[in-house]
Amino acid sequence: MMRFTKFYAPSLKEAPKDASLPSHIFLTRAGFVEQIGSGLYNFLPLGKRVLDKIKNIVKEEMDKAGAQEVNLSFITPASLWQESGRYNVFGKELLRFKDRKKNEFVLGPTHEEAMLSLVKNKITSYKQLPLHLYQIGLKFRDEARPRFGLLRCREFLMKDGYSFHANEEDLGREFELMYKTYSQILQRMGLDFRAVEADSGAIGGSGSKEFMVLAKNGEDDILICENCDYAANVEAAKRAKKTCQDERPEANYASKFHTPNIKTIDSLAQFFKINAFYTIKAVVKKAIYENESKLVVFFIRGSDDLQEIKAQNACSALELVDASEEELEKAGLVAGFIGFVGLKDIDFYIDFELENEKQMIMGANEKDYHLIGIDVVNLNKDRFKDLIEVKEGDCCVKCGAKLKQSKGIEVGHIFKLGQKYSKAMNANFLDENGKSQPFYMGCYGIGVSRLLAVAIEANHDEKGCIWNKTLAPFVLEIIVSNLKDEKALEFANKLYEDLTNLGLEVLLDDRNERFGVKMNDFELMGFPYALVIGKGLENNEIELIQREDLVKELIKTDELMEILKKKVL
């Protein structure tokens, strides 16, 4: 019997001072969650009910796909992370600690190493493959600035799965299966999402897709083609190669021109009266590695911008930071006049789209001079990388239509890890020829607690949460407008019992509060429907309110059950 007088849902009149996003404001105010520290949250009964529904959907679909559930320790020996090589790569977000015996451990943000250790030396033959194990449990990332409530916290509930395969083809099959499984999970939750091309980040691997729920407060920029199914995170987006109809600058190869104080692309284009499309921009960054740092130069078209994650991946750095003027001078680089012709002792990369371009303009590596007539040919193929930031209005790499930029929130990520971890940790099996081979691995994560917040980011109004029937903690709230009205209270109790017996999740608001307070709480908590039992009962009428648009409908009591079965059940 779920009556409001017995239900623990402490609501707040004011939002937390650090709350800026609707999900953070409403979930805290409505009593779904309670913050107990920086990036740390308790889930109260309302939040736990939603969390359980999300977990059940995830579990049902994963089990249907043939994955098997396990439950690994929250704590992982640091030696496993050292063995895989990720101990230092992951950075400060990985919480490291020692026990009383000085043994080193980590709180796992992901469990590739732990899961590989689980199957290592136990799965020994190709006959035991493929295998897919998953868990739904707590993870921890020591975020520098936890914010946005459940969207960027330190402790979170996540489903992480790991698959093991005898060959790359079978890994590809499982990757496609998980693509369909994740799509089904999010469809069942009623969320508007896109599966997008993505960067693999610290987890690594040969390919990955992110699952993004569209929301105007999304933290990620994504590019979507509305003509085909192409979608990508801006960090990984590609485009059809750009062209320009304006005239190219004409000059002999690598002619040197005096360009006094012409340090920017705009001033360079104006100086030569050309489109910036025909210029080459140099962006200098300091690349941070595990044991060293060095300057790296990235050359892109003057009309484009550098995408820093792409640049970081191109040079395999842990991080890229801006280079100072002193560092440039020490390396012999002249800011505003850098080019790759004659560039010595410095790593450099060139954007793919510049390969085989002709009659370009770029710096001459000499103050106040540029080179005209540069042909980007006969260079080492390894220097050419995808470096540019794709933008709205660029053309789709698949069909050529215009790309549109949207905001999204990442809720899931699937990876083809290949043999990266199995080789590092010497985890092998015997193939059908009796030869020892490293496993091919995939990993698949979905943010369970994050989905709770994402559902509200995608569905809310100025009054509060708007839950759909699939995720709502209660599908229907019965509100008695006046507890002194004994007939109304008796009718509400009987209706509550009848609906509960039908399997409907109902909350009976039997509090001795003003009607306005009850309505405000209904709108804040966001249950899909409310039945208001008040004076209309004298005329055998009850008011049904739909939370999504707050439309009200008077229903005759003798038609009530039939209408509820159609709309609510």
From Swiss-Prot:
One GO process term, biological-process aspect = prolyl-tRNA aminoacylation
Cellular component terms per the entry's GO annotation: cytosol
Keyword Magnesium listed? The answer is no
Q: Where in the cell is it found?
A: Cytoplasm
Q: Name one Pfam family in it.
A: tRNA-synt_2b
Picking any one GO molecular function of the record gives: ATP binding
Q: Which reactions does this protein catalyse?
A: tRNA(Pro) + L-proline + ATP = L-prolyl-tRNA(Pro) + AMP + diphosphate
Q: What is its EC number?
A: 6.1.1.15
> Does the keyword Zinc-finger belong to this entry?
no
Q: Which family does it belong to?
A: Belongs to the class-II aminoacyl-tRNA synthetase family. ProS type 1 subfamily.
Q: What does this protein do?
A: Catalyzes the attachment of proline to tRNA(Pro) in a two-step reaction: proline is first activated by ATP to form Pro-AMP and then transferred to the acceptor end of tRNA(Pro). As ProRS can inadvertently accommodate and process non-cognate amino acids such as alanine and cysteine, to avoid such errors it has two additional distinct editing activities against alanine. One activity is designated as 'pretransfer' editing and involves the tRNA(Pro)-independent hydrolysis of activated Ala-AMP.
Whom does it interact with, and what assembly results?
Homodimer.
Q: What is the protein name for this chain?
A: Proline--tRNA ligase
Q: Which organism is it from?
A: Campylobacter jejuni subsp. jejuni serotype O:23/36 (strain 81-176)
* Protein encoded by which gene: proS
